[in-house]
């Protein structure tokens, strides 16, 4: 499959987080308990920093949409599209779910880069008009990191390792994009994504996969795009601002 992305996979195969990131801010968020790490890797493309608190609040809200997975994954957590739709109806100020997806993507003994491109095509459909060049770069890096460079992330809060067999590794991976740019206009888009990944390889191999390696995959992708009118940080209660500063930034 041809790679149509602005940032070629070959340019980020070693460490995608070291590629140029425009105005994007990559932050790990904390939930109410300061000892608990948010299980969504939050990637924010915010043109106006006055709206960064809004991105944090949305990420914290959708943290509650992570649910236990199927039997093959043990106690692993994964963003649930169905639960996310429920959460979206409770968020204030009121927003709207613009699109959502629950889709399986598979491949048999093909390069990891092929699976990455398949997943990218699904998520580009969800993101839609918010796809400026820098957002495509961030999306490409995030999806690449979902399947490669796992040894550097194996103990991070956004990845959960499920049950293993002699020839299969199961894991979940959770990412959230918050986007406010010229394409989004007067709203912020929040796009949480949950992956259930079954790969026909032992964990020690999976941890060191590059985009040139080959493997068989069965991947379930659950995601939605939530649009909320822009909310200035000054409109949030001071307690929310203090909590964000102390527990997040």
Swiss-Prot record:
Q: One MF term in GO for this entry?
A: toxin activity
Q: Does the keyword Ubl conjugation apply?
A: no
Q: Which InterPro entries match?
A: CytB_endotoxin-like_sf (IPR035918), Endotoxin_CytB (IPR001615)
Name the UniProt key words of this record, in alphabetical order.
Answer: Plasmid, Sporulation, Toxin, Virulence
Modification after translation, per record: Active after proteolytic processing.
Domain of life, per the record?
Bacteria
Pfam families assigned: Bac_thur_toxin
Q: What biological process terms from GO does the record include?
A: sporulation resulting in formation of a cellular spore
Q: Which Gene3D superfamilies match?
A: Delta-endotoxin CytB-like
Q: What cellular component terms from Gene Ontology apply here?
A: extracellular region
What's the stated role of this polypeptide? Kills the larvae of dipteran insects by making pores in the epithelial cell membrane of the insect midgut. Acts on mosquitos and black flies.
The family classification in the record reads: Belongs to the cyt1/cyt2 endotoxin family.
- Name this protein carries in UniProt: Type-1Aa cytolytic delta-endotoxin
**Organism expressing this protein natively:** Bacillus thuringiensis subsp. morrisoni
Question: Lineage, please?
Answer: Bacteria, Bacillati, Bacillota, Bacilli, Bacillales
